[in-house]
Amino acid sequence: MFMKIIFISSVIILAAADEFIESEDQYDLNINPPKEEYKNQYESNNEYQPTSEYNNNKKPSKTDYENQYESSNKYQPKSGYKPKKVICLDIDVTKQCKNRADGNYAIDNKPRAGYIACVNKSPICMPCPYGLTFCAKTGYKGLGHCLGEYDECQSRSY
């Protein structure tokens, strides 16, 4: 019985050792691959030959760069471009809106029943309450104020 246990354990150890030796050989091949297999893999028959300008360590002339990227087609914007329409109180106020330098929209200096404001760079309609009119000359950052019929427009405050 004791001999069977020793025999079985020696067979297991022998199989494990054989497997260990094979994996060690594979590991060694992965770390140090044979040089003959990879010798010509990255070498090409057509070697790159730089131009004479590069051989002499000269920079190519500016005209070479310009000619390389130059196109005979010049950009021509469409002649029929129209800005996005701005509708306020169901009225197209695109012509009356000014896109101010601060990114806000406002109706021109004429009093209106509503005005255009800009929230997150999107034009929205801000109607004045009943009985009030819009004055574009006043307000913070070009948004204007709603004023009563007899109120005077003050100078714009920034």
Swiss-Prot record:
**What's the superkingdom here?**
Eukaryota
What switches on expression, per the entry, is described as:
By a wide variety of microbial and tissue components such as bacterial flagellin and lipopolysaccharides (LPS), dsRNA (reflecting an antiviral response), cell death signals, monosodium urate (MSU) (the end product of the urine catabolism, which is one of the principal endogenous immunological 'danger signal' in vertebrates).
Pfam families per the record? CBM_14
According to its UniProt entry, one GO biological process term is:
defense response to virus
Q: Which GO terms describe its molecular function?
A: chitin binding
Q: In which tissues is it expressed?
A: Expressed in the endodermal epithelium and in some interstitial cells in the ectoderm.
Which Cys residues form disulphide pairs? Answer: C88-C135, C97-C146, C128-C153
| Stretches the record annotates as Disordered | 32-80
Task: Give the residue range of the signal peptide.
Answer: 1-17
Protein name in UniProt: Periculin-1
The role this protein plays is: Antibacterial peptide. May also be active against virus, since it is induced by dsRNA.
Q: Which InterPro entries match?
A: Chitin-bd_dom
Enumerate composition-biased segments (Polar residues): 41-58, 66-76
Q: Which GO terms describe its cellular component?
A: extracellular region
Q: What is its main location?
A: secreted
Q: List where in the cell it is found.
A: Secreted
Q: Which keywords does the record carry?
A: Antibiotic, Antimicrobial, Antiviral defense, Disulfide bond, Immunity, Innate immunity, Secreted, Signal
